[in-house]
Amino acid sequence: MIILGATPIGNLGDASPRLREALAAAEVIVAEDTRTAIHLLRALGVESRPRLIAMHDHNERERAAEIVELARETDVLVLSDAGMPTVSDPGFHLVDAAAAADVQVTAIPGPSAVVTALAVSGLATDRFTFEGFLPRKPGDRRSSLRALATEPRTMVFFESPNRLASSLEDIASVLGADRRVAVCRELTKLFEEVKRGTAAELAEWASGGVKGEICIVIAGAEAVEADPATALEQVLALVASGTRLKDASNEVAEATGLSKRDLYQAALAARPPKASQDARVRPAP
């Protein structure tokens, strides 16, 4: 059997009795970083010396078959550096391979940065989506945010402290300066901090430099029905500035939730015929 064990995200006191028992009984531990696993065993006073296997993003696919075969013979405890394996951490391919091989998979629930950030954010938690890390490159990041512009659910992201300020600036630019945001830093640790405000306010705050492990929680978009006429004007304005019609239609559709096809067809119909366009740019002979 494969056992997914949720480990503390900062406070060792959050290690559950079940996790401690599993660590003490484990003959095989699969860890994202074996050094972190050894540190956890020592910190919790576990004296057993299990076989340790490293499984990370770069070797999980190759290791999965070997670990599944081991799990046929003995319980295999799988750990990430912090939190639950498979959640923005290695483990998905292993669980998939185990399911395909009819090997049982169970989990020891526990600490989660995603759920903890949601709980303390002050934003709606009845429906949410976890988006992992925002893209590193600014253009890719803004594109990802545009795709989420009309997402009605609360959104949770992980972010590097080095990119926090620029990401918050992009959030303010793409999702709106007044969009409600919470930045959760060093959750469960000594210097835990939750900063709440608008995207613009938090972008200014982060510009001074922020350290630690970061979760960003963003309020979902309010349900506002887009006006097709206004959206069409936006498409035509983009086209007039040099954007291709197809690209302009796609961009406005992402931002408004309207149909790309309908916007494209409406813009085609609204543009003057080619002959009249040519007449404006070519003088009469």
Where on the chain are the PLM-derived regions?
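A contiguous loop/helix-start segment that scaffolds small-molecule binding in enzyme catalytic cores
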Residues: 154, 161-285
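Short active-site oxyanion
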Residues: 23-29, 102-106, 154-155
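Class I SAM-dependent methyltransferase SAM-binding "motif I" and its flanking Rossmann-like core
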Residues: 92-151
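Short Gly/Thr/Asp-enriched flexible loops that form oxyanion-binding sites at enzyme active sites
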Residues: 86-101, 168, 172
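Loop/turn-to-beta-strand initiation segments
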Residues: 1-2, 73-77, 153-154
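Conserved helicase motor
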Residues: 53-62, 134-138
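Glycine-rich, flexible N-terminal cofactor/catalytic loop recognition
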Residues: 1-57
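General beta-strand structural signal in soluble alpha/beta enzymes
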Residues: 32, 80, 105-110, 157, ...
